[in-house]
């Protein structure tokens, strides 16, 4: 699948655009250190945008009926994405909780795969958080879902305000975790506990 996506990128067009960008900033794209840069950057972005055209809910291919009705939490799922405003990285951790309905659970790796698909595209952290939650709701129809994403944005570290180390936290709650503040707080405390 990865190879398919890499092949679907218009490499020639991407390489030409990067070549022109280097010229636009006053660089010589024909100098030794930059000769292969357009090709390398196009290949890198093809990999970083593997999630384009994919739906994160399609990652939930394994759904099992178990006698489990209590919360399931997977925390600390590392990810990186590209800010769609500045095309620089943001990266961090996603924490996912869901309360199974009728014992429907999924493979734990499927949660990480959904994060991967949703993050590998030009993205906003707020949208990323919602897309992960919505994919889980559509795939499993749980009683409740809560997604928390903590990330550092290079657009705040490298430019503008220049505040390295600052983290942005976003949450999205669905079902019981949206309706009940007490239930939501309990799950958040489990997510943030070391």
Swiss-Prot record:
InterPro entries documented for this protein: GTP-CH-I_C/QueF, GTP-CH-I_N, GTP_CycHdrlase_I, GTP_CycHdrlase_I_CS, GTP_CycHdrlase_I_dom
A GO CC term assigned to this protein in UniProt: cytoplasm
Catalytic reaction annotation: GTP + H2O = 7,8-dihydroneopterin 3'-triphosphate + formate + H(+)
Pathway: Cofactor biosynthesis; 7,8-dihydroneopterin triphosphate biosynthesis; 7,8-dihydroneopterin triphosphate from GTP: step 1/1
Gene Ontology BP term (one): tetrahydrobiopterin biosynthetic process
Keyword flag Metal-binding: yes
Keyword Metal-binding: yes
An example molecular function term from Gene Ontology annotations: GTP cyclohydrolase I activity
SUPFAM superfamilies: Tetrahydrobiopterin biosynthesis enzymes-like (SSF55620)
Record EC number: 3.5.4.16
Gene3D superfamilies: 1.10.286.10, 3.30.1130.10
Lineage: superkingdom: Bacteria
UniProt subunit comment: Homomer.
Family: Belongs to the GTP cyclohydrolase I family.
PANTHER family linked to this entry: GTP CYCLOHYDROLASE 1 (PTHR11109:SF7), GTP CYCLOHYDROLASE I (PTHR11109)
Name the UniProt record assigns to this protein: GTP cyclohydrolase 1
Biological source species: Streptococcus pyogenes serotype M49 (strain NZ131)
């Amino acid at each position: 699948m990865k190879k398919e996506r890499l092949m679907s990128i218009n490499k020639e067009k991407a390489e030409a655009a990067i070549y022109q960008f280097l010229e636009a900033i006053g660089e010589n794209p024909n100098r030794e250190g930059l000769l292969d840069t357009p090709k390398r950057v196009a290949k890198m972005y093809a990999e970083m945008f593997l999630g384009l055209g994919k739906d994160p809910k399609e990652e939930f291919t394994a759904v099992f009926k178990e006698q489990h009705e209590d919360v399931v939490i997977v925390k600390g799922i590392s990810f990186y994405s590209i800010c769609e405003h500045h095309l620089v990285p943001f990266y961090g951790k996603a924490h996912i909780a869901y309360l199974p309905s009728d014992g429907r659970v999924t493979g734990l790796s499927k949660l990480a795969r959904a994060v991967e698909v949703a993050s590998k595209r030009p993205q906003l952290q707020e949208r990323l958080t919602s897309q992960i939650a919505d994919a889980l709701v559509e795939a499993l129809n749980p009683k409740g879902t809560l997604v928390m994403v903590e990330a550092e944005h290079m657009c705040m570290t490298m430019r503008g305000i220049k505040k390295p180390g600052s983290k942005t936290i976003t949450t999205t709650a669905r079902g019981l975790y949206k309706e009940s503040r007490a239930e939501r707080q309990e799950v958040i405390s489990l997510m943030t506990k070391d």
